[in-house]
Amino acid sequence: MADRQEVVLSERERQCLRWVEEGKSSWAIGVILKVSENTVNFHVKNAMRKLETTSRTQCVVKARRLRLIE
């Protein structure tokens, strides 16, 4: 299981997860961050891989628990 010492999320991955936590879609996050929906999905999927999760919700919960997002 990934723990705090092993996991480093990029600033963009953290930004995307914060917006996912607010319930925003990838499209809406892309509009907010001025990037494409595919770019948002890329960052979210990278965070999911790093945190060894299988859903966006699990990823946000684990990132919050590990204090990777505030």
What are these regions (language model features)?
Residues 2-4, 46, 63-64:
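Residue-level signal for pocket-adjacent positions within structured domains
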Residues 14-21, 48, 60:
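Hydrophobic residues on short alpha-helical segments
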Residues 56-66:
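Short, basic, alpha-helical segments at the C-terminal edge of helix-turn-helix-like DNA-binding modules
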